[in-house]
Amino acid sequence: MKDRQRPPVLIIGAHRSGTTATARALELVGLQIGQRLDSHREPRLLQKLHEDYLRRTGGAWYNPQPFLKWIESVEGKQDCISYLRLNVRRDFARIFGYRFNPKGLWLRARLNFGRPWGWKEPRTTLFAPAWLEIFPGGRIVHVIRDPRAAASSIRERELKFQAAGDPPTPNLADLNYCRQLVQAYLTAGERFANSANYQRVQFEELQANPPAMLERLANFCGLRFTTRQLAGAAASVRPARVKSTSS
């Protein structure tokens, strides 16, 4: 029966690039992305799974270069694949955000009957080569936002965290560093740009025309949806903020 489980949809992109809004909208048109998720529609255990391995390599989500260098090697890629595969076999449900309650069991059972599913977690952008070995045929939805806007948003969030009393995250108060970080994620995601299973979405275009962009994405993901579902999903996407011309 498990042979009928579809390959997942991986929603990737740099932090603060619109991946949350995109994932929420796709969920509303039928993409199953788990039930035990944080406010950004991410499974916490998947975040930890990724971050623990990043730190093994001397990196972190905000310092991906050591990991990216490691996974380029045959040894590094195979080690990463083994790490992810072992953990998924042990704890598929919790890693992908499913509870051990009747609804969670029902949601997981639907996967065995071909329900479209996937997940959103920005670090997946870095880990995608390994995930696609574990789930051959997986589809990539790569959400891209203007790099300057994404970098500014990362820095602004960091400064808010510090103002609230959180310890500083290395280098994230530096706008130039944030720009380099966004570019590293962008380059990592574009490794798959020549694949038929890759779909790039410019977040500003999604904000400008949610119905058309979401319909295209939903079709790419193999979703079946109603006009009402599409309208509801489109309404969930906030329009871009209009900046004052005096600023």
Feature-to-residue mapping (PLM):
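Residue-level detector of flexible, active-site-proximal loop/helix-junction positions
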Residues: 40, 147, 205-207, 232, ...
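PAPS-dependent sulfotransferase catalytic domain
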Residues: 105-228, 246
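Residue-level marker of structural boundaries
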Residues: 31, 159-160, 239
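Active-site micro-motifs of SAM-dependent methyltransferase domains
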Residues: 28, 33, 149, 208, ...
